[in-house]
């Protein structure tokens, strides 16, 4: 630009140079995709394949399948509309605060391209250069699973507008002891299944004849003794003692996509005989009867897990108190917080903010002993439907003696369209209830004790 202004003073002499500059500029602009008429081939396919197709293909949650040009162009106007108003792709975390793996986020220019494409009639473009649609494994996060276990019985969800809490046992028997690299949970009913916390039961050699003993689906009554439930499920060894239980090997919340760590991080030992225990299987209220038969997919590893991950829950049912106690008065917007202090230096892998329907916003951060703040996650507009386990691109290193803090704002007024009560009622934590209409405030973190070099590990795949 400076060059241009200078030349302007001596117009005659500068004119050919200016023409030359203009020519270069035109060539440059026309070779630059962004200003070109967006077509399916030159721009739209790659945007949709990255940000939409993972959930919009057969067997996935998104209803519409967006794989071929026909499927995508047919819905160009709808795609333009849902992206313009920010409804899709679903990514509640503020990317200006912290960044994660596998973000579903459109840049301003991608957003504009989708609008422009729809307005101009969704052209295909150069049909010889259509990008290949991405390869996905049906119903699967990555390659073919080594073991697929389905709930032995489908759960009939009665349409009585009441929350339901179940425990399912998925027994298995394999050829020999092995290692688990990753576990994937595929809900059979994504509309109604709100939560699941999966544990792994391992029977030592010779301790259990028939892993299928007992009931496979039991209602989880909050007041019933847990041991009684475990006995009904036939979890005990043949001598009546209980086998080892590895807690929280897999968790599900609305929209969660399973996390897969690089080899060497996470993973579990898996004995020849055992069972997955799907606890806290929580189905939201529905007026229409429905059913669920969820599936667990297991990916075996070759090596023993070197660095098992640790999980910590802050807040409701967790290790730190919610302050003030989580009681949300009607017709008010109120704020709560919870925090812990780290007793060792840690490498933080994932964070999962969890609230229910009254959630309005959420913020998680760490404060180092020297006073510096490490931003962890910020959700400016809470959305109950998308509660990812956000995975950092690289572990976030948090020094020993840091405070890990979470702040949640709840909107218990009539202006919250998700408020389950009209007029609003006092809502809060109730005993150990996890009903959708009661509230929870949790910040779940997964981490490793720090090791030198952790800051350079890539968690992307
Ligand atoms: C993480 C999964 C996920 C991603 C990524 C995603 N969607 Fe969706 N989408 C869904 C689900 C699930 C629904 C069903 C609606 C619901 O339950 O809220 C949906 C619904 C829709 C609908 C139907 C809206 C209606 O009114 O019926 C459209 C259109 C849509 N998505 C377009 C897109 C587009 C375009 C993208 C990419 C820019 C995208 N989605 C990315 C999961 C996803």
PLM feature spans:
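A surface-exposed loop-and-adjacent beta-strand signature within N-terminal beta-sandwich domains
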Residues: 73, 77-78, 86-101, 197-262
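Bacterial Sec-dependent N-terminal signal peptides
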Residues: 1-39
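Beta-strand-rich globular domains of non-transmembrane regions
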Residues: 230-302
């Amino acid at each position: 630009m400076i060059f241009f202004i200078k030349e302007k003073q001596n117009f005659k002499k500068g004119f050919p140079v200016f023409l030359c500059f203009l020519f270069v500029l035109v060539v440059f602009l026309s070779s630059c995709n962004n200003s070109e008429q967006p077509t399916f081939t030159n721009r739209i396919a790659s945007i949709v394949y990255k940000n939409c197709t993972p959930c919009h293909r057969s067997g996935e949650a998104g209803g519409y399948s967006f794989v071929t040009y026909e499927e995508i162009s047919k819905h160009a106007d709808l795609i333009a509309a849902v992206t313009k108003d920010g409804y899709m792709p679903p990514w509640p975390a503020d990317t200006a605060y912290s960044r994660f793996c596998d973000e579903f986020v459109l840049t301003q220019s991608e957003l504009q391209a989708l609008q422009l494409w729809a307005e101009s009639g969704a052209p295909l473009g150069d049909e010889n250069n259509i990008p290949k649609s991405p390869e996905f494994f049906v119903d699967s996060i990555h390659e073919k699973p080594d073991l697929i276990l389905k709930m032995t019985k489908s759960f009939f969800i009665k349409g009585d507008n009441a929350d339901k809490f179940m425990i399912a046992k998925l027994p298995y028997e394999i050829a020999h002891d092995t290692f688990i690299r990753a576990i994937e949970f595929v809900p059979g009913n994504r509309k109604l299944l709100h939560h699941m916390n999966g544990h792994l039961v391992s029977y030592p050699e010779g301790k259990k004849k028939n892993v299928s003993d007992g009931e496979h689906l039991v209602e989880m009554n909050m007041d019933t003794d847990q041991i009684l439930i475990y006995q009904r499920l036939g979890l005990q060894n043949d001598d009546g003692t209980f086998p080892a239980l590895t807690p929280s090997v897999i968790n599900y919340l609305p929209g969660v996509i399973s996390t897969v760590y690089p080899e060497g991080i996470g993973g579990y030992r898996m004995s020849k005989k055992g069972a997955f225990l799907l606890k806290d299987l929580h189905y939201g209220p529905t007026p229409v009867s429905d059913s669920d038969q969820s599936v667990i997919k297991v990916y075996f590893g070759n090596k023993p897990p070197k660095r098992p991950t640790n999980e910590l829950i802050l807040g409701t049912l967790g290790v730190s108190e919610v302050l003030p106690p989580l009681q949300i008065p009607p017709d008010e917007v109120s704020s709560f917080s919870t925090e812990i202090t780290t007793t060792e230096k840690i490498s933080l892998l994932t964070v999962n903010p969890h609230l229910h329907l009254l959630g309005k916003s959420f913020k998680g951060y760490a404060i180092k002993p020297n006073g510096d703040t490490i931003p962890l996650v910020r959700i400016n507009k809470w959305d109950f439907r998308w509660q990812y386990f956000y995975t950092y691109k690289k572990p976030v290193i948090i020094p020993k003696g840091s405070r890990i803090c979470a702040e949640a704002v709840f909107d218990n007024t009539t202006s919250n369209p998700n408020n389950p009560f009209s007029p609003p009622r006092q809502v809060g934590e109730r005993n150990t209830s996890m009903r959708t209409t009661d509230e929870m405030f949790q910040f779940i973190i997964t981490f490793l004790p720090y090791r030198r070099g952790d800051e350079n590990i890539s968690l992307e795949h």
